[in-house]
Amino acid sequence: MGVYIPPPNDNDSDKDKKKNKNNDNPNLNPEPSGDSKKVNNVIKGVSSTSPPGTTTYYIPNPSTWIPHNPSAGLIWGPLTPSSDNRPALYGMVGLQFILGLGFFRAARQLYRPRTIVTSVNSIPQHFTPKGSFWKASIPALTGAVAIYGCGLELSRLMLAYDPWYEEAKYYRRVAIKNGDKPSAWFGAYDYYKPMSTKAWIDKVGIWIKATEHELSEKQEVLDVSIVQANSSNPDDKGHVEHVLIPVKKNNLMSQMNKKGKYVEIYNRLRESNKSRYRTLLDTDLKDVQELNKAERIDLILEGKSPYSNPEYTKPHIQLGNHHVDTDDEFEMVWLNFEPWDELKLETDYDIRLIPHWRWADSDNSEPELDAVEQQHNHSISEAESSKELV
């Protein structure tokens, strides 16, 4: 019994031609997986004259292996640690300072005069001329540059806001999130290109101007509050003495360091809010409970509540010929006059910028403080409702 072999089909020849074309075209070959997918990390070496079926080699870019961490005054080049590794930066600054002192010592050894002893009883002793000034100037200049760079780097580390620090810290988190383990010394240097020195100077300059303006506004508010405090305390004869207490003003750098970063600001606001909650719950809102809610509402309606504000004026809304007897009429009047906009014009807002995400160490919240915050929010809502009823 014979075996039937079908004749060649035209479609098979077309498939072979397409396959050969795909092998000839290097752009249609799949890219390798792994570290070669990183941006600017590999150089693809493909020859257009390579025959089909050959292996394509991917040569890594050697420049991506060298860290390029920025610094303000360090001279260590590729050995410079990441900007978010502060202990390593302080250590390199100290090492550079010691190196600068070593260069100064070498310059002193080259330039100081030397004695020549001709005989044992030769008095006075003879001194050789001083060494070459140019030979001693080279290590002296090198030491001066090294120590000056230490000063610049320390000035950068003293800043409360460092764009290089924030950038390195962000990309280290990105690398950890992607499953990589960045170097503890160099950071995630293969994930980003640090910003230039000019961009860093511009960002720091903008931050310094904004912080200086904010501190000046706070100082003006403090001066006004001191004057008001003095005017509210008259003497025995009834005279009011307007005396401005001099406040010691520190330099701008120390005030910026006291201001701190956003995390410190957030923690400071949280602590101040907690103390205000406790003060309100211990004094004004001490008797505000759910058990005496009906009694408090009755006192508010009768105008005998201690929480009612007699100086509060309701927003002036002119209804004209409209009535609000039914729900439809009330909705029509509400949409027509927009009382929320009226209330918005008569309300002052105090806006504080806080981070929109939480740190890992702030996840553990105290249950007592949460209960205090809930009770305070409930009390505030009742106080606002009482104002509207009045």
From Swiss-Prot:
Family under the similarity heading: Belongs to the MGR1 family.
Parts of the chain on the Mitochondrial matrix side: 105-135
Subcellular location field: Mitochondrion inner membrane
Gene this chain is encoded by: MGR1
Function statement: Component of the mitochondrial inner membrane i-AAA protease complex required for mitochondrial inner membrane protein turnover.
InterPro entries listed in its UniProt record: i-AAA_Mgr1
Residue ranges, annotated region (Disordered): 1-55, 365-390
Membrane topology, as annotated: Multi-pass membrane protein
Pfam families: Mgr1
Origin superkingdom: Eukaryota
Biased composition range(s): Basic and acidic residues: 373-390
Transmembrane segments: 88-104, 136-152
Keyword Iron-sulfur: no
Source organism (scientific name): Scheffersomyces stipitis (strain ATCC 58785 / CBS 6054 / NBRC 10063 / NRRL Y-11545) (Yeast)
This protein's GO CC annotations: mitochondrial inner membrane
Name under which the protein is recorded: Mitochondrial genome required protein 1
Membrane side Mitochondrial intermembrane: residue ranges: 1-87, 153-390
Keywords for the protein's UniProt record, in alphabetical order: Membrane, Mitochondrion, Mitochondrion inner membrane, Transmembrane, Transmembrane helix
Record's subunit section: Component of the mitochondrial inner membrane i-AAA protease complex.
